[in-house]
A protein has these predicted regions:
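Extracellular/lumenal ectodomain signal focusing on beta-strand-rich modules
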Residues: 54, 83, 143, 158-159
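Aromatic-lined, polymer-binding surfaces characteristic
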Residues: 222-466
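Short carbohydrate-recognition loop motifs
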Residues: 43-64
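Extreme N-terminal leader/anchor segments
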Residues: 170-241, 245
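Extracellular carbohydrate-recognition regions
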Residues: 19-38, 173-174
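Sec-dependent N-terminal signal peptides
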Residues: 4-14
Length: 466
């Protein structure tokens, strides 16, 4: 009996429990994590997404990081809810993947998925067993492993939860995991579709050159937007808030020679405010406050801080091709990122990271959706009009090439016009009797601000071909 108790206690000490808990890799490598083949695993402070350290895996071609777990029994019901969540730091974009494999007691692969390494920085890795590959015949899992690509390299892991027993229903497909959600829920028909829309191409051709009238119209729209967004003097409150938040962010370059360390930035669903973690609203606070100070007061420190924050936000996952695990309702927290980016546009154009900034702004504005007309069954239109129409407009106007501005504005105006049709059933939008629906029902109070935003866009483009 004593021996049995000892074995149970020993196993509990070295094998992660079937009851999920976040592993932050703060002190030592858990006993359950072992490397097979050439390579090494260790605790590192070079990068972290929680606490002050992460798990560094230095791998060689074909090596694996093996993790023993308490047996996990899946079935057709709980495999929809169960999964794995973690964040992975990749230092350099690659054209390969890390393969995750989940094994039965015979060591056979029952479930697997590939995590693409095409981006640098912290990116989320969230996926339920439902959306993994594999024959899924044996649903009793006793271990999982990460399989290295056919090269030498390293990645960093943090914020690991396995098994996650209540996967976020709004898990967002992105460049890293494009098939981690079936997107069958109508509430997902806009926040979580940003990567799907990224696969679309414009059917409006890029003009070889603009006419003098088109150039004049773009200048008119540009001036209207500037007049609308400019204020008489820099608001001191937002500037003070930017510096206060920046101090809490504690951003500094990693001694690895690339990337940063600092306060983690995650989606609100994952944010632990008690630990001081930050989210999109904190990015907005810093970028907008520093932009006001740099633009109106010509404060060089604020200008430097603005780009430091932008670089850090991208490194943390607020970037092109990233869904940050879940991105739902982010539009409410990023509006001023766009309005103040317009004020900073000349400085952005001159910055060596210009393309990264602009691609981030376009991606999170979901401008890519407007490469095609609005789908007749598109739901949640009121959210898009209210929170992201201005972001789309500014992103379209911030193409350095005026020809691309014209193409993007043409696509956006067409998309908006096609979205203002009457929508069927309980699909969000405008109904034949003049009422509006949102979240599948009558939603009059929200509509005032929504239609005001649409009216602003009409005013910006009024009297032009756009």
């Amino acid at each position: 009996m004593k021996n049995s108790c000892f074995i149970v206690l020993f196993l509990l000490g070295i094998i992660p429990s079937a009851f999920a808990q976040l592993i932050g890799f703060e002190e030592e490598v858990p006993e359950a994590f072992k490397v097979s083949g050439k390579g090494e695993v260790k605790i590192s402070s070079l990068f972290y997404k929680e606490g002050e350290s992460s798990l560094e895996w230095d791998f060689q071609p074909g090596s694996t990081l093996d993790v023993q777990i308490a047996p996990l029994s899946l079935n057709t019901r709980n495999e929809k809810q169960f999964g794995i969540t973690l964040w992975i730091y990749n230092e350099k974009p690659q054209q390969d993947s890390i393969r995750f494999e989940f094994l039965n007691k015979e060591g056979e692969v029952s479930y697997w998925f590939s995590y693409r390494l095409q981006a640098a920085g912290w990116r989320a890795c969230w996926i339920s067993f439902e959306y993994m590959q594999g024959d899924k015949k044996d649903k009793k899992i006793v271990a999982y492993r990460l399989v290295a690509p056919q090269r030498k390299g390293r990645i960093f892991l943090d914020r690991l939860i396995f098994p996650e027993k209540k996967m976020n229903l709004r898990t967002t497909p992105d460049q890293q995991l494009p098939t981690n959600n079936g997107l069958s829920n109508r509430d997902l028909w806009h926040w979580c579709l940003v990567w799907k829309w990224e696969q679309q191409s414009y059917d409006i051709p890029l003009p070889s050159k603009l006419t003098s009238e088109q150039k004049k119209e773009l200048k008119t729209i540009e001036q209207r937007l500037t007049d609308f967004l400019e204020v008489k003097k820099a608001p001191q409150g937002p500037i003070n808030a930017a510096y206060k938040t920046f101090e809490k962010a504690a951003i500094s370059p990693s001694i690895a020679g690339t990337g940063f360390i600092g306060t983690p930035i995650v989606a609100p669903d994952e944010q632990d405010k008690k630990k001081g973690e930050m989210s999109w609203n904190d990015i907005e606070t810093m970028l907008s406050g520093f932009a006001y100070d740099a633009y109106y007061n010509q404060n060089e420190t604020s200008k430097k801080n603005y780009f430091t924050v932008f670089d850090y936000a991208i490194d943390q996952g607020f970037a092109y091709g990233s869904g940050m695990g879940t991105n739902h309702h982010y539009g409410y927290q990023v509006r001023k990122i766009y309005t103040t980016a317009w004020l900073m546009r000349d400085a952005i154009y001159k910055h060596p990271h210009r393309d990264a900034y602009l691609s981030t702004l376009r991606f999170w504005a979901a401008l890519q959706e407007t490469r095609q007309p609005c789908s007749p069954t598109r739901d949640e239109l009121l959210d898009s009009w209210h929170t992201l129409l201005m972001a789309k407009f500014i992103s379209a106007m911030m193409f350095p090439d005026a020809r691309e501005q014209a193409q993007a504005l043409s696509g956006l105006s067409r998309w908006l016009s096609s979205s203002l049709r009457y929508t069927p059933g309980t699909i969000g939008g405008i109904k034949v009797d003049g009422t509006t629906f949102h979240h599948g029902g009558f939603y009059p109070g929200y509509t005032t601000g929504v239609l005001a935003t649409v009216g602003e866009y009409i005013a910006f483009t009024n009297g032009t071909s756009f």
